[in-house]
């Protein structure tokens, strides 16, 4: 077994875990074949040794004591940290400032760890930090489906209380074409198992994944699955991939066509219209999303969310283009910002300067986002 190399952190986390301590249990993704995801493509998967994960927890506990000035923190000299320890110190300091309420287990699917080992990690976290309110993790539906209900309930009892699952879509056609490695039925099975275990469940829906051809199927099939699962959160994510990415490697007949912002708004509208009998919180909490004001709880906010989407769809083409540019440039946050004369004038100026019109707005914005992605800004 390789020697302990120090505290580790993985590359990503959900936006909702911005204040969480990031604790790495695994490296990269055990599946790593989804056509739309490039995060781990150049890296192989590995499980970190249990002893290393427990040592990471002890390291953070010691650093927190030292940063607080606790008299029993005699074994850590903050001014003499090695380069490998600086990352842990930064993580401990940031977590301490945020209130030390939540922990996110990395990387892409921490539940592939042996249940007994994961439970030991959770118990050690609770022993070291008894005031933690939330411990969360990414998980794949295929992984959850293989875990016994008893083990899931034991994980929940040990403190794991929220799971983030990349549903992406519940269309079996699309799931096969994007090589997701799961099915609609398995998505439903996994979601229900998490709910029965008493954990919160966030399901992520990838808007635009079906292109224009499969937009309606994506919306309807995904809504049908969500209606059976009734997750605590439904979170929308706008698909962003580099040009040249083969999104449908599992199909010889179909090629993905990038949908416009209007098509994606219509897709989200259709999906929300199809949601019935559930009490999920809907969130659009990512910088890529055009309409971040899509935020509400079902069923009471359903009509308000529908009205927001319909308002964007019904805008005259020129105003719709202004809003698209205003959102991507940071001038607008909400549809109502179109009514602010100063901000709107600035956006109109941007459109004139760069020759942006209703006919080319999606292409122009796509080119801008592609440049930013290639520069590593996202």
Predicted regions and their residues:
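Conserved SAM/AdoMet-binding glycine-rich loop
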Residues: 62-196
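Hydrophobic faces of well-ordered beta-strands that scaffold small-molecule active sites
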Residues: 21-23, 101-105, 135-137, 163-165, ...
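Catalytic cores of alpha/beta
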Residues: 147-153, 211-228
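Conserved strand-turn element in the central/C-terminal portion of the radical SAM core barrel
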Residues: 142, 166-176, 193-218, 237-243, ...
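Canonical Radical SAM [4Fe-4S] cluster-binding loop centered on the CxxxCxxC motif
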Residues: 12-76
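Aromatic/hydrophobic pocket-lining residues that form the small-molecule binding cavity
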Residues: 53, 118, 148, 187, ...
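Conserved, mostly hydrophobic/aromatic
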Residues: 29, 37, 53, 105, ...
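Auxiliary Fe-S-binding modules of radical SAM enzymes
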Residues: 1-17, 227, 233-235, 241-378
